[in-house]
Swiss-Prot record:
GO process annotations (BP): ribosome disassembly
InterPro entries the record matches: T_IF-3_C_sf (IPR036788), T_IF-3_N_sf (IPR036787), Translation_initiation_fac3_CS (IPR019813), Translation_initiation_fac_3 (IPR001288), Translation_initiation_fac_3_C (IPR019815), Translation_initiation_fac_3_N (IPR019814)
Subcellular location: Cytoplasm
Name listed for the protein in its UniProt record: Translation initiation factor IF-3
Native source organism of the sequence: Nitratidesulfovibrio vulgaris (strain ATCC 29579 / DSM 644 / CCUG 34227 / NCIMB 8303 / VKM B-1760 / Hildenborough) (Desulfovibrio vulgaris)
Its job: IF-3 binds to the 30S ribosomal subunit and shifts the equilibrium between 70S ribosomes and their 50S and 30S subunits in favor of the free subunits, thus enhancing the availability of 30S subunits on which protein synthesis initiation begins.
Length: 176
């Protein structure tokens, strides 16, 4: 790790390497291209820091500002962005082709709750033994789930067979 660049990779004051910089004042006004030392002196005179805003520009763009305040605002923006992120989980419900009505209703209630919470839901019909011959029963159950949740969900992934299972994915309809 290089010592002249701080952890957050924003150069300030003496860490700026360029001889000349395009300077932006504390209120956002353009001060033109001046030498780095003059810019640092100007910033120190105002009790502020010279912060490199755009290092790739030619000459680099630097701004006179309070570095501590700038760093604090960047941290707040990062926290706010992190807060707005939503983690979508995939919940799975497993049923069998011989699932009775009451059990189906219970599973349906769970699927509806998952979708209301904003999670995607994978519905899996798994077959045992010779049940695999009756894939049509599994497809009927999956179609019934789609029909019973059409007010909350859209079909995200069509029913597909994988080994001894039939699977489909339901995604919640975005709320307006």
């Amino acid at each position: 790790m290089r010592r002249d660049v701080p952890q957050d990779s924003v150069r300030r004051n003496e860490q700026i390497r360029a001889r000349e910089v395009r300077l932006i004042g504390a209120e956002g006004e353009q001060l033109g291209i001046i030498s780095r030392n003059d810019a640092i002196a100007l910033a120190k005179e105002k009790g502020l820091d010279l912060v490199e805003v755009a290092a790739t520009a030619d000459p680099p763009v630097c701004r006179v500002m309070d570095y501590g305040k700038y760093k604090y605002e960047q941290q707040k923006k990062k926290q706010e962005a992190k807060k707005r992120q939503t983690v979508v989980q995939i919940k799975e419900i497993k049923v069998r082709p011989k699932t009775d009505e009451h059990d189906y209703q219970t599973k349906l209630k769970h699927v509806r709750r998952f979708l209301e919470e904003g999670d995607r839901c994978k519905v899996t019909v798994f077959f045992r033994g010779r049940e695999i011959v009756h894939k049509d029963r599994g497809l009927t159950i999956l179609d019934r789930f789609v029909e019973d949740t059409k007010d909350l969900a859209k079909l995200d992934q069509e029913a597909r067979a994988e080994g001894r299972t039939l699977q489909m994915m339901l995604a919640p309809i975005p709320k307006k």
